[in-house]
Structures are given as C-alpha cells and as structure tokens.
C-alpha cells in the first residue's frame, strides 16, 4: 500500500470504530466521536482547539471548537464509550490473561478554574499538586508484548458522586467482569493491599495477585504473623534471571522464589504468599488465590505475572505521553471524563482494533521512526505506531469527513506483528 492508501484505510477504520462505540447513540454523537478520535490521533493532542484544527472545516475555527465542546458535554457519552471498549477488548481476554489495575493521576499544576480540582500525588515528580485521579485496567499476556486497554475513568474526591478510591477500583473490576466473566487474573500493586478490597475480591471469587505491604498480618499455621516476618523466614528453592528494560538499557536481576500457605484474618479461604528476593532490600511479597505447588514453573508463573508490570509500565504511560493528557484544557468535570474515555478508546484503537496488516503497513512506511525506538524503550511499537498514524493523517489532503468506514479484517486472518 502507498501512503495515500494507508491514510485512507486509517480514516475508514476510525469511522468504523467510532460507529461501533456509538451504536445506539444519535448520529451526531457518532460523528463527534469519529472527529475526536481523528483529531487526537492526527495531532497527538487532547486540546479541543487542536482537534478542531485537524478537521480543517470551511468555517471559523471558534465555531468548530464550540460545536465540539457542546458534543463533549453529552451526558454519559464517556460511560457508553467505556462500555463498548470493554466489550471489544473482552474478546481477547483468556483464562490466564493478566488484568492489571493501574491507578494514576492527571496533574494540572497551574489550573484554577477546572471543576472539582483535587489534591493528587504526581507520580512522575513525587509531589502533591492539583489534578484528578484515574483508574485503568489493561490486559496483558505473560508471553507476549501485546496489551489490551480495557477501561479508564477519571474521578475526583471533590466531586459530589465520589465515594472512595476503593469504590472506584471495585467499579472498574465489576464493569470489566461483566464482559470477561471469570476469565483473567487480576494484578495490583501495594495499593491493592486493603481489607476493603480483599473482602470483595474473595466474596466475588476473583483470581488475583496483589503485592503486600510488610505490615500486613496473615494467618500461618493457626497464628497471626507479619507478612514480612514470614517472607524473611521463607525457604527459597528456585531462582531465575529476569531482565528489566529501562531507557538507559537493560538491567539483569537474579531472583529467588518461595511460598507459604496462608489465610487472611477472619477469612477461611486458602491463599498463598509467594516471596521473591533479589529485586531490592526487602523481599517482594505477593498474595494470590492461584493454585500454587512446590515447583519452579508454578512459583515463577506468579512472580513473573506480577513482574510483567515492568514490561508494560512504559506502554501504560503511552497514552499520557503520546497524547499529552496532562495538557487537557476543558473546565467541566463531565467533559473531562468524556475526553479521558475517548483517549482510552484511541489507545485501544492503536493497540487492539487496527488489523495487524495495517500496523505493518504503518511501521513499514514509518521505519525510520520505529528504528529510533528499538533500543532501550520497551514495547516501542505503540509509540512508533502513534507517530506513524500522526504522520499519515497529518499528511493526508483528503478531509476526514470524506472518509468512509472500512470493513474490519477477520482477526484470524491478521498477521502477527
């Protein structure tokens, strides 16, 4: 395919995807979502002004901006889009797919008039500032680099409908589970080490791997013991070398693994504490519902499933960096939530929806940019794809409104990338 053909296919796929997301909504909503996706992908920006500029309409720019802002405020638009993204992604979730819950933030350092601004901890600068929280769910396989963006929602503790961070986490889990059922293994970092999350997880019979804080009490052989004390005394019969890819290169760790069978105080469920050493001063403690036996394969599956977070952390940051989410400038809370849902849909479009044959075409034409990302950056292809899509769409002379929806290729016929 030449450049114009690839650009045409991309526009058609955006139209097709937007139609899928907005099924059951007014036609004008589907048009808006398609335009928003096109603008975000072609400008790599969440600014309404940039999205408006990408459409190149034969009217004053402010008129286009006003129309987009009105549509962005459509009630429950984000909720409908999120539901459709989960529905699309659920097709790819298998029994052992890792469902990684990732809390994050959108920092607005200089904002003053955005609705329900709240205190957040800036994860990159390790400081407290103004902004919003997000919770996302990303599917991943242990043996591949592919990710499945499933869910993302922005919230504020200052909003009238806010209950708690635990409620937002459980809302994410329940919404995804409505589509994936019992498939998948839920993975959380230390933010999941809370009784108010463990109890609902166990009540729902969810398979999970959660990293523990050292001060968590567990029941071992009938006695309450600190998790850290159990970990320090745990036999470590197996070892493995793991590689962490960083911006400066690769770092090799030699880890050792062991386990103890435990319970949570006040609960009857048999759980397993998997202990991993070699990554830092204190051992890594993972509490899981998975069936674990004394074998290298069984223990390493749990350890490597959690460490899979390393490999996709950069990809999880992909949306934040590639589309400059923290540059978002709408003031109303519902519009903010709707825009985040559309950005999440754009990430899903790049990572999952696009047929592999089209991804190959984009990467082939954009080989130089892709090559620059081969070394030191995990999962470079998503960044390269985003850059390639931007280059094709920006260089296209045909207005987006002239694009026609393209039929989607059968997933079974797609080439592996």
Protein language model features and the residues they cover:
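Single, function-defining residue in the core of a domain
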Residues: 1-45, 84, 97, 109-112, ...
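Short amphipathic alpha-helical segments
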Residues: 34, 48-49, 65-66
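Active-site-proximal, Lys/Arg-enriched surface segment
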Residues: 37, 65-144
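Short, charged amphipathic recognition helices of the HTH superfamily
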Residues: 43-53
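Polybasic, low-complexity association/targeting segments
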Residues: 52-56, 265
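Short, basic interhelical loop/turn and adjoining N-cap
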Residues: 55-67
């Amino acid at each position: 395919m030449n450049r114009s053909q690839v650009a045409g296919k991309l526009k058609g796929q955006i139209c097709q995807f937007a139609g899928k997301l907005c099924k059951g909504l007014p036609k004008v909503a589907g048009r808006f979502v398609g335009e928003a996706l096109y603008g975000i992908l072609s400008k790599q920006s969440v600014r309404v002004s940039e999205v408006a500029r990408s459409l190149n309409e034969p009217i004053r720019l402010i008129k286009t901006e006003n129309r987009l802002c009105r549509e962005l405020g459509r009630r429950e638009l984000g909720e409908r889009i999120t539901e459709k993204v989960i529905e699309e992604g659920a097709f790819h979730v298998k029994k052992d797919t890792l469902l990684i819950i990732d809390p994050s933030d959108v920092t607005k350092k200089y904002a003053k008039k955005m609705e329900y601004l709240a205190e957040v901890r800036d994860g990159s600068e390790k400081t407290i500032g103004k902004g919003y929280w997000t919770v996302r769910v990303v599917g991943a396989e242990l043996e591949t680099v592919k990710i499945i963006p499933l869910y993302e929602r922005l919230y504020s503790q200052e909003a009238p409908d806010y209950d708690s961070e635990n409620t937002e986490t459980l809302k994410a889990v329940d919404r995804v589970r409505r589509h994936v059922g019992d498939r998948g293994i839920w993975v959380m970092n230390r933010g999941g080490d809370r009784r108010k999350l463990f109890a609902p997880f166990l009540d729902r019979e969810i398979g999970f791997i959660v990293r523990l804080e050292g001060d968590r009490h567990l029941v071992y052989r009938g006695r309450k013991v600190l998790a850290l004390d159990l970990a320090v005394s745990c036999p470590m019969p197996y070892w493995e070398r793991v590689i962490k890819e960083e911006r400066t290169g690769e770092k090799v760790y030699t880890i050792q693994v062991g386990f103890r069978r435990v319970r949570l105080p006040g609960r009857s469920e048999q759980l397993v504490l998997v202990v991993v050493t070699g990554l830092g001063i204190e051992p890594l403690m993972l509490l899981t519902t998975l069936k674990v036996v004394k074998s290298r394969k069984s223990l390493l599956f749990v350890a490597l499933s959690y460490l899979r977070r390393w490999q996709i952390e950069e990809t999880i940051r992909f949306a934040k960096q590639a589309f400059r989410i923290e540059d978002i400038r709408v003031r109303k809370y519902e519009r903010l939530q709707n825009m985040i849902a559309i950005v999440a849909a754009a990430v899903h479009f790049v990572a999952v929806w696009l047929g592999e044959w089209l991804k190959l075409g984009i990467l082939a034409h954009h080989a130089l940019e892709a090559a620059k990302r081969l070394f030191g950056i995990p999962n470079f292809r998503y960044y390269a794809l985003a850059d390639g899509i931007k280059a094709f769409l920006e260089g296209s002379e045909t207005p987006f409104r002239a694009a026609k929806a393209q039929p989607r290729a059968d997933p079974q016929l797609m080439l592996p990338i």
